[in-house]
């Protein structure tokens, strides 16, 4: 009989532990989940037989095909922060990179004058959905670590992207400090 009581007590503990995640999740349903986003900055490249480049379509209203290196040169891991800024005729995105990102931005902009950076972004509830946001022309060496461009998105989408990318950047830097 005593064995049954002990087994019943363990069963109740296991049952409580099994139900705990569901109870915690139901308590958090009122909280808004933090948005995250992803950023990939690629560099324009010539088509190659080795398969290291690919053509992408940038801009939705008047699509332009740009051939890029498949591997991004910069990501959200290189960011310090992003913000939406006022620009002539609307708004632009300003991406401020860390020391390594600043160095990469300077090296690639100096070596690829006359070509394009191609920016890909993902944001929102289904981050798997994303698109090519811009292909800013490289007209000079960028030594200050700041890339500014006009994105192919609405102001609301830009605000969501910036909030998500800043949250992702904060999470990355928090993980690096641990």
Predicted regions and their residues:
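Structural signature of multi-pass, alpha-helical inner-membrane proteins
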Residues: 2-6, 27-178
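Sec-dependent bacterial lipoprotein signal peptides
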Residues: 1-25
